[in-house]
Amino acid sequence: MVQLLAGRWRPTGARRGTRGGLPELSSAAKHEDSLFRDLFEDYERWVRPVEHLSDKIKIKFGLAISQLVDVDEKNQLMTTNVWLKQEWIDVKLRWNPDDYGGIKIIRVPSDSLWIPDIVLFDNADGRFEGASTKTVVRYNGTVTWTQPANYKSSCTIDVTFFPFDLQNCSMKFGSWTYDGSQVDIILEDQDVDRTDFFDNGEWEIMSAMGSKGNRTDSCCWYPYITYSFVIKRLPLFYTLFLIIPCIGLSFLTVVVFYLPSNEGEKISLCTSVLVSLTVFLLVIEEIIPSSSKVIPLIGEYLVFTMIFVTLSIMVTVFAINIHHRSSSTHNAMAPWVRKIFLHKLPKLLCMRSHADRYFTQREEAESGAGPKSRNTLEAALDCIRYITRHVVKENDVREVVEDWKFIAQVLDRMFLWTFLLVSIIGTLGLFVPVIYKWANIIVPVHIGNTIK
């Protein structure tokens, strides 16, 4: 009974016949195992696989990008996930498929055979090579290796038109030790493959093209492939949360001159705007690289607005000083000041004319033939004249104060239109070049890529 149960529960492979307790290999596995032993028994992965020493290996090189991970403006780095496509002929990996059960393709780990030492020259994190994956080897010796890699490459960031900027970042690939007489690189496809590209939320790739070049020294020449990525920043985020608030603060400065001069909040409003602009400038400093070669567009606009606000504080202080002038604190108003600010400028600024309310004293010219006696009526007239002179003097003082206040209003209105005009011209002068560049460079490239 025990023998019957033992025979019933015997493993299937054991019934068919085993080799050391393991199932025997199938015919295909035997052929592939034999093929690997024959190919790699005397294979040396450090030796360049050529028939003659003077022969050179031609590497077909292509690039596919799967993701533009990040563009670090501060450290001037571009992080990408790419696939390196390489294909070459290994004369030591050839076989006749008929001798090995019709096997035409095998997969071999890249660390088991000779591979070209093609690296990214402008790498910024010290990782010059990609991941180690399997290669596809065909019976005629063709080796295809698609190598995934995550690169941080150096990229010179031009922030002149930030955040409406267009960057050109390049990736330069070449052999680390072999010259062109030993390993030559052939550009397989000029365009970077973007079939499996995952869109980035901040950057858009306008074009990605490759080109071949050669570097020559005293003895040898070294081929390399350079891929240029033209990328455009998507400016919606920075426009909504950076540019529009800055423009709003700039025009808010103009509103200061619409407040009455006797309001103390004018200086407070100007100071608050200046502090807000300083905060925006600190935010910009954290984003853009520290460089003295170029000043970003938004930085120029912030500096322009800060100077604008500083001048507005100065002229506001001057207007408040004019508003509180009187005959007891300052000398009499100069005739040219009266003519310009009380008669000329109000008409040009569409303000209500300031009537001349100065009292014109009538000349009292009474001539007498001889001294008259002072009677009661004359004494009363003297009292009336005294009161009249006192009233006229107070009226003159009050009218002088009103004239200075009106001049302060004229200055506020003049500065209102002047600063509004300067703000509009400055804003258009800084952003029109960006609009021109956008219309003449970025839009045609985008349309061309869409048609393609």
From Swiss-Prot:
The chain crosses the membrane at residues 240-260, 269-289, 302-322, 415-435. Activated by a myriad of ligands such as acetylcholine, cytisine, nicotine, choline and epibatidine. GO terms for cellular component: acetylcholine-gated channel complex; cholinergic synapse; dendrite; dopaminergic synapse; neuron projection; neuronal cell body; plasma membrane; postsynaptic membrane. It is a multi-pass membrane protein. It holds the Pfam family Neur_chan_LBD. It catalyses: Ca(2+)(in) = Ca(2+)(out); K(+)(in) = K(+)(out); Na(+)(in) = Na(+)(out). Glycans are attached at N140, N168, N214. Residues 323-414 are cytoplasmic. The keyword Metal-binding does not apply. One of its GO terms (molecular function) is acetylcholine binding. Residues 28-239, 436-452 are extracellular. Disulfide bonds join C155-C169, C219-C220. InterPro entries: Neur_chan_lig-bd, Neur_chan_lig-bd_sf, Neur_channel, Neuro-gated_channel_TM_sf, Neuro_actylchol_rec, Neurotrans-gated_channel_TM, Neurotransmitter_ion_chnl_CS, Nicotinic_acetylcholine_rcpt. Keywords: Cell membrane, Disulfide bond, Glycoprotein, Ion channel, Ion transport, Ligand-gated ion channel, Membrane, Receptor, Signal, Synapse, Transmembrane, Transmembrane helix, Transport. SUPFAM superfamilies: Neurotransmitter-gated ion-channel transmembrane pore (SSF90112), Nicotinic receptor ligand binding domain-like (SSF63712). The keyword Transmembrane applies. Component of neuronal acetylcholine receptors (nAChRs) that function as pentameric, ligand-gated cation channels with high calcium permeability among other activities. nAChRs are excitatory neurotrasnmitter receptors formed by a collection of nAChR subunits known to mediate synaptic transmission in the nervous system and the neuromuscular junction. Each nAchR subunit confers differential attributes to channel properties, including activation, deactivation and desensitization kinetics, pH sensitivity, cation permeability, and binding to allosteric modulators. Belongs to the ligand-gated ion channel (TC 1.A.9) family. Acetylcholine receptor (TC 1.A.9.1) subfamily. Alpha-5/CHRNA5 sub-subfamily. Neuronal AChR that forms heteropentamers composed of two different type of subunits: alpha and non-alpha (beta). CHRNA5/alpha-5 subunit is only able to form functional nAChRs when co-assembled with another alpha subunit, can be combined to CHRNA4/alpha-4 or CHRNA3/alpha-3 and CHRNB4/beta-4 or CHRNB2/beta-2 to give rise to functional receptors. Interacts with LYPD6. This is Neuronal acetylcholine receptor subunit alpha-5. The lineage of its organism: Eukaryota, Metazoa, Chordata, Craniata, Vertebrata.
